[in-house]
Structure formats: structure tokens, C-alpha cells
UniProtKB/Swiss-Prot annotation:
The keyword Cytoplasm applies. It comes from the Bacteria. Mo-bis(molybdopterin guanine dinucleotide) binds at residues 259-264. GO terms for molecular function: sulfur carrier activity; sulfurtransferase activity. This is Sulfur carrier protein FdhD. Coiled coil: none annotated. The lineage of its organism: Bacteria, Pseudomonadati, Pseudomonadota, Gammaproteobacteria, Enterobacterales. Belongs to the FdhD family. GO terms for cellular component: cytoplasm. The active site is at 122 (cysteine persulfide intermediate). It comes from Proteus mirabilis (strain HI4320). GO terms for biological process: Mo-molybdopterin cofactor biosynthetic process. The keyword Cell division does not apply.
Amino acid sequence: MDETKSTNLLTKRVIVGIDQTTVQHKGSLNQAEQDYIALEVPVALVYNGISHVVMMASPKNLELFAVGFSLSEGIIGSSNEIRSIEIVESCHGGTEVQIELSSRRFMQLKERRRSMAGRTGCGICGTEQLAEIFRPIAPLPFTQTFSLSLLDNALEQLKTVQEIGELTGCTHAAAWLSPEGQLQGGCEDVGRHVALDKLIGLKTQQKWTEGAILVSSRASYEMVQKSAMCGAEILFAVSAATSLAVEVANQYNLTLVGFCRRGRATVFTHPQRLTD
């Protein structure tokens, strides 16, 4: 490890990784080395004083997470329905994100409120009824196109928003691509759903409307649903897509592309938005 680096990985005054002494096994040799470990902390989203969900996440860009989660979960329809967001460190080693909703939205939330302890890879923990899993989303229009010839360069650009991942090998990334294939911005997190929610918050903040989403993970149905909820018509995933992701993408008119690697990709649904 470079001795000029801090003992903690510090990003914009937020500690997102720590030093850890490890034993590296290489061939027949065991050697003690310092390594970076990505921080994973409990983050509670609290709406109008009532805890709604606890997710395991990287302690960075939590305001964006609050906005993105609220939008992708249908808690709000517009960021204007959030009156304030405050980040409060908890005495239990976690973080509370205190979100003040408009009265109308909070009343609606109370009607459908669920208490759940989320995990890094879990998007439906604590959902009380199966009907709540599939949200009624209007089919997306066909207004966006994207050239697959731009994908290789986009994959290279994705590395620029994976600062924590480069040092720890432990995070997922989600990025917004312009129709010309330029990376407009991105977010990373130990949880793939959280990384996407943070991106949705960033997309809302920056008012991006045209383009596509690129994620470093697989495409589960939750990733498809969150993308559709924010109006994205195209979702590129570095890894595979699940059967339910393909089914939901078809239902929402979302173009789903998996196995995005240099020189190749697999188009699962609605290829008409893609050009060579």
C-alpha cells in the first residue's frame, strides 16, 4: 500500500474504507500485508420521525440515496415532496437519514408502511404482500436510442466512478450515460441496489432525462424496476439478467442488456432502441 495514503480511505471527508492487516497466501508463502476494506454500515431511513427501513450501505452520498430510494420505491413522485434531509450519526455505529416528507406523502406512506431490516443483496426483505413487490408502472415510451458501438468506451469510463472499488474490490457502481455514450456521473456502494438508488438521486439532482443506465452488477428484477421508476428506457448490466428481470423489463417496455463486456453484449428485451 502506498505510504502516502491515509490510514483511512477518505472521500470528501467521509470515511468509506479502513486499513486491515491481512495474511496473503501466494503459492507456498504466507505474508502479512496491509489491505483496504470497504466500510459497510447500517443506514436507517427515517421518514417524519418513523423508521422505515435499515439498509447496509457505504456511508457516502446518503442524501442522494435518500432521494433515489424514495423515488424508486414510490414513496414520492417528485423530489419536491421532500422538505428536508438530515444525516445523523447513530450511537450504535450506524447512520440515520432523517427525511421530512410533505404531509400528503407521509400519510400515504403510513398506509403502506412496512418495517424491514434490509441486507446488501436484498430488495424485498420485509415486504408484507406479494402484490407489493410488483409496482404498477406505466409502460415506458420509445423515445431513446443508443449505439452499441459506444458501449466499450462507456465500460472504460465506468472505472472512473469506482474509486472505492479500485482500492477494495468490494463495491458496485451505477452510472448515467448520455445518448452519445459519455458518462455523465455515477455512484458506487457495497450494495448494488443502493448504488443505483444513489444514481437515481444524482440523476434527479442533475435533471438528466436522455440516456441510459450502466451498472457493474447483474440485473435483478429490482434493478429493472428501479430503472423504470426513474424513467430510464435502457439498462446495461455487466453481468447476467435473471428470468424475472427479463419478464419485468418486457412488461415495462425497458431495453435490458446483459453481459456487457468489451466487444459483446446480450440484448434480452426491446432491441429496437439499439443501433450498431
